[in-house]
Amino acid sequence: MIRMDTVTDLSLREIGVAATKVLGRAVEVRAESHIGRDLAVDSLALMNIIMELEDTFDISIPLDRLASVETAGDLSKLINDLRTRA
């Protein structure tokens, strides 16, 4: 059985990879990292990160679900929820 913290770690790592790729700079991502404030991600960059993550995890992230996402942990949880429903 796969532990949930392992899945979350994978999601957080992939969020960091996507953010680094989109932003063109190294990004350290923690569950508590606020996407806008701590990671300095604007709305356009966020959409590009979301597209990278959709490709990585082969999921579609509904825009209405993003409204409640503030931290990398929130985004990781959303990704994991969508992956388990796929």
Curated annotation (Swiss-Prot):
Q: Which domain of life is it from?
A: Bacteria
* Residues with PTM O-(pantetheine 4'-phosphoryl)serine: S43
- What does the entry list under GO cellular component? membrane
User: What biological process terms from GO does the record include?
Assistant: sphingolipid metabolic process
| Domain Carrier span(s) in chain numbering | 6-83
Q: Does the keyword Magnesium apply?
A: no
Which pathway does the protein contribute to?
Lipid metabolism; sphingolipid metabolism
Q: What is this protein called?
A: Probable acyl carrier protein CCNA_01221
